[in-house]
Design a protein with these regions (language model features):
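Conserved active-site and cofactor/substrate-binding residues in soluble primary-metabolism enzymes
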Residues: 36, 90, 177
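C-terminal cap/substrate-recognition subdomain and adjoining C-terminal extension
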Residues: 2-21, 97, 104-248
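Active-site neighborhood of HAD-like aspartate-dependent phosphohydrolases
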Residues: 13-69
């Protein structure tokens, strides 16, 4: 008997893997804006009677130290914790109104135009641009939205029934946690970290900076300046330009 012919199965087309896109990750405090976004958040909270005058002056002193001495892990952690605790017991809607006010009254006046231009250049060249900040997620979201950036990765505050508990969800987005956060984002959004850029002023962000193919130091502290020079990274110091402009 003749052999029964077998109908060849149609081969399924091989699904081509989409090429990975690049992104640019920007720290916020002293990189996108001068000073601490959490302090500016606290200032607006004080103006809305969220906390006492005593707490306000503690914030003011912390801001002074931050601007002139740079980040300090212990001081920064204390500042972030205090800022987050201010929202305990308040409605989520109140926080949303507050962060809009923070941007309009304070943050937009303290933006570094040069860094904002860098971020917008990345957008124009087809890259995603993400803010990576220890400030509350809601504040990061507002800054990203107002600047027409892709989005923000920030510290998340727990919500229950429309009320803020003042407790963190996960860890503050600071130091090594920033590296973990951008790696998770890259995996979820099919981004190539090797093709990506990262910008920061602080040596505390070295874990994030060294996770990408194109790290850039912006208004760097002393430790980051030394590291960036040794590694031959681009360095932008907009503080010196501002001081020179003020003298002219």
């Amino acid at each position: 008997m003749p052999a029964t012919s077998k109908v060849a199965k149609t081969a399924k087309p091989v699904k081509k893997e989409q090429p990975k896109k690049a992104a640019a990750f920007f720290d916020v405090d002293n990189t996108i804006l001068r000073g601490s976004s959490s302090f500016l958040f606290g200032k607006s909270a004080f103006e809305r009677n969220f906390f006492s005058r005593k707490d306000f002056w503690r914030f003011a002193w912390a801001q002074f130290r931050f601007i002139w001495k740079g980040e300090n892990n212990n001081k920064l952690a204390s500042l972030k914790d205090r800022a987050l605790s201010l929202v305990e017991g308040h409605r989520v809607r109140d926080l949303e109104i507050l962060v809009d006010e923070v941007y309009d009254k304070h943050i937009k006046l303290k933006l570094w135009p040069e860094t904002v231009r860098l971020a917008k250049d990345h957008i124009a060249e087809g890259r995603e641009v993400w803010l990576v900040t220890a400030a509350p997620q809601e504040l990061g979201d507002v800054i990203a939205k107002r600047l027409n950036l892709t989005g923000a990765i920030g510290t998340k505050v727990e919500r229950k029934n429309g009320i803020l508990t003042g407790k963190l969800v996960g860890k503050p987005i600071h130091g090594p946690t920033k590296r973990v956060a951008i790696k998770d984002l890259a995996k979820n959004r099919n981004l190539s970290l090797k093709k990506s850029y990262a910008y920061s002023d602080s040596h505390n962000d070295l874990p994030m900076l060294t996770a990408v193919g194109h790290p850039v130091a912006v208004n760097p502290d002393k430790i980051l300046t030394r590291y960036a020079k040794a590694a031959d990274w681009p360095i932008y110091d907009f503080k010196k330009r501002e001081l020179k402009a003020n003298r002219d």
